Each structure stands twice: as structure tokens, then as C-alpha cells.
Amino acid sequence: MNRGMKPINELISPDTKHYSFTEPFQTELGATLPSVEVAYRTWGTLNEARDNVILICHALTGSADADQWWGGLFGEGCGFDATRDFIICSNVLGSCYGTTGPLSPNPATGRHYGPDFPLITIRDMVHVERHLLRHLGIERVKLVVGASLGGMQVLEWGALYPEVALALMPMGISGRHSAWCIAQSEAQRQAIMADALWKDGWYEEDAPPARGLGAARMMAMCTYRSFRNFEEKFGRQRQEDGTFKAVSYMHHQGGRLVERFDANTYITLTRAMDMHDLGRGRSGYEEAVCAMTQPVEILSIDSDVLYPKSEQQELACLLPNSKILYLDEPYGHDAFLIDVERVSRMVRDFLQAISRKG
């Protein structure tokens, strides 16, 4: 297993921009962050009317570099067309790709936050994104789009800022995190904490809990794909050294994440995902979802074992102005990252439909 995360400048684009809050930020649960810095990327040009904005929300281990992890959606005539639209993607609060999170310095102690970084919610992430848009002079977003953790943000954008988020496209997600997903995340967190190098979250920069984080990623990958996908891709095939190809793939994925992600960050963000519930603190789940009247297209993945299509169907039944689209692929939850041609077409078609309605 690799020893740890590469330097941040090797992991994010040199085109990354940064915005620093001028005042402290109070989280939904009452903690105060004295300062917040947001890393973000933009593509295209903001038009004179400032109404050609698309906001992309990234998933758990993603970054603001949407043109890298969702590159197949970028290009003229594609879902994200920088000749037509002004496209924004920011790294979420609590992450490790330039936005304030556990790796950031804590002004109160002079060292990084580590496990002292406060418990945050999806709503906190969205509020931070709203701050960024205000800084950019943007008051309307014609489409907010994202999958998984990104899809949670999309839905909260619709609930928190309906006057800004004019249309929504959540993918591979539910309106509230299920017990199944919460249990999966807790098992992954416990794998990290079981590593001898965890040290209650105060691990050394050059000696992180790499085995634990790698194991957590392996566990997650089993839920990001599907039975059929693993059988078709690996079956019982072996490498030349006799190792099952499925085993080799797991170790490869675990090692790759260790090189580019932080353990405290993984715990922070998965806990935020566990808090996801559109009805929490509102008038109730059904009432909160029914109150979202924007045009919504929900992308459901037939083979998703994390967020089964019954959850997207429930959302579609409650959202008054929604439509559900299906990716009938064997790839599992990660299909939104794999079948980019179809996903791009779906995004493009939704944008055209929004434009026609005016």
C-alpha cells in the first residue's frame, strides 16, 4: 500500500482559483470556522445577463476539476459546453483539494484541524457554494447538477435556494440517506480507525493510516459497482502470479485513493452524507420535497446497490415538476462516471428543454 497523499499542488489543476471568506462561517450545527477558503474552477464566459450558469457538484472523493473526472461531458455540443455556458465547480467544505477541511490550519491551535474539524452537513456545503456565487456576482443558476454526494447538494440547493437554483439534475441519490448507506459508511470509517497509524486522527503527515483508508476504499468499491459488473469484468480469472483479478483490482483502487485523499477528510464527508435528509428540521420529509417546484430530472441507475431506483422513484413521485431517467447499465452506482456519452446527452437534452420553456 502507498504511504500517503501526494502534495496538493500535484492533485489539483493549476487553473484552480481561490476565494476566502471575509467573515467567520457558522455551521448548521453551531460550530464556527474563523475562516473558510474555497477552491473552484470555471469554464466559459458569464454572459451579460448572468443567466448562463451551470453549477456542478462533485462526489465524495472528487474535486473542483470536473473536466478531469467528468471530462466526457465537456465539449462543444456536449452537456457542458463552455462556448455556450459559464460552468462552475467548487471543492466542497470539508474536502482536501483546496477548500477548508481537516487538512487546513486551525487558527486556534496553529496546526491542522485533523479530527477537531467540526461535524458538517450537506447544507453547510451548499451555503459555502452560495457564498462563492455571491462573490462571483451570480444570483441565478440555470442548472445545478451532480451525482452521489453531489446529488445531495443538488437537492439541498433546490430546498435552500429555490430562487437561485432554477433547475436540478440529481443523479444516483435519494432524498435521505438510508440505514443501508449509513451502515456501509460506518464500516468504512471503522476500517480507517482500526489502522494502528490512525492515532485518534492525529496521524503523522508522512505516516497516515494508509492500510485503513485503502481498505475503506475497497469496501466502497464493492458498493460502487455491481455483482454483474464484477462477474463480467473479472469472473474467477487470475493474474500470472495466481492472484484473483478481482483481488488485484481492489488493491489497485485502494492504493490509488491513498495517494490522493486524506483519512480525516473521508470520515468528515461520509458523516456529512449520513446527515442527509431533506426533511430534517423542516416540516417533514414529504412536505419538504413536495415544496421544491423547480424542473427536476432525476437520473436513476438500474444496477445501483447503494441508492436503488426505488429511492429515485420515490423522489419523482413527490417532486411536483420532475421526470425520471434510467441508465440501464451493469456498472452499478459509478455508471454516471462510466457511461459519460449517455449522461452528457441527458444533461444536454435537459438544458435544451429548460431553454425552450424559457
Curated annotation (Swiss-Prot):
Please, one GO biological process term? homoserine metabolic process
Q: What protein name does the entry list?
A: Homoserine O-acetyltransferase
Is Amino-acid biosynthesis found in the keyword set? yes
Q: Where is the AB hydrolase-1 domain?
A: 52-337
Top EC category = transferase
Which reaction does this chain catalyze?
A: L-homoserine + acetyl-CoA = O-acetyl-L-homoserine + CoA
| KW Cytoplasm (keyword) present | yes
Per UniProt, subcellular location reads as: Cytoplasm
Which HAMAP family does this chain map to? MetX_acyltransf
Pathway terms, separated by semicolons: Amino-acid biosynthesis; L-methionine biosynthesis via de novo pathway; O-acetyl-L-homoserine from L-homoserine: step 1/1
* Domain of life, source organism: Bacteria
Q: How does it assemble?
A: Homodimer.
